Design a protein with these regions (language model features):
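Conserved alpha-helical scaffold segments that buttress catalytic/binding sites
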Residues: 1-148
């Protein structure tokens, strides 16, 4: 990884003290990073081995009682489910797994959500756009259910 590229934003934010590594978790990583930045990480392979429910329990356990901001990178999905991204990498999670995780975040005190890396020029059949819209919709539904 270069000193500054699309994959170093978290490293730079941590180095500048903008991210509390003890309160952070990254799920679904598939590329290797030499820098141990102190963030709890669950790779895509670990998710496949552990199962979606166990990973969700791990997420909830790690973040319970904290204020949570979710940043969802669409390329966590396997290119079969999200081909329209700038960095497709095989071995990602399925869209149903992403939806299960997003829906399962309901117990957390989430204050915001973003979804990034959708690239329409690479999304010829709008497969990625549909997945992204569904994920965002489900998160909005989770937030609405928290209000009631």
């Amino acid at each position: 990884m270069g000193e500054f590229d699309h994959g170093t934003m978290f490293l730079r934010a941590i180095q500048e003290g903008l991210i509390d590594t003890d309160s952070s978790i990254q799920v679904g990583l598939r590329t290797h990073n030499d820098a141990d930045v102190g963030i709890k990480q669950i790779t895509s392979q670990q998710l496949h081995e552990m199962g979606t429910k166990a990973v969700l329990e791990e997420i909830l356990s790690h973040l319970q009682g904290r204020i949570v901001y979710v940043s969802f990178d669409i390329d966590v999905l396997d290119p079969a489910f999200a081909p329209g991204t700038g960095t497709p990498v095989s071995g990602g999670i399925a869209s149903w797994q992403a939806l299960t995780i997003v829906q399962g975040l309901a117990p957390l005190n989430m204050v915001g959500f973003d979804l990034v890396e959708v690239s329409p020029p690479f999304d010829h059949a709008e497969i990625t756009a549909i997945a992204a819209a569904t994920i965002i919709y489900d998160w909005i539904c989770v937030k609405a259910s928290q209000k009631s």
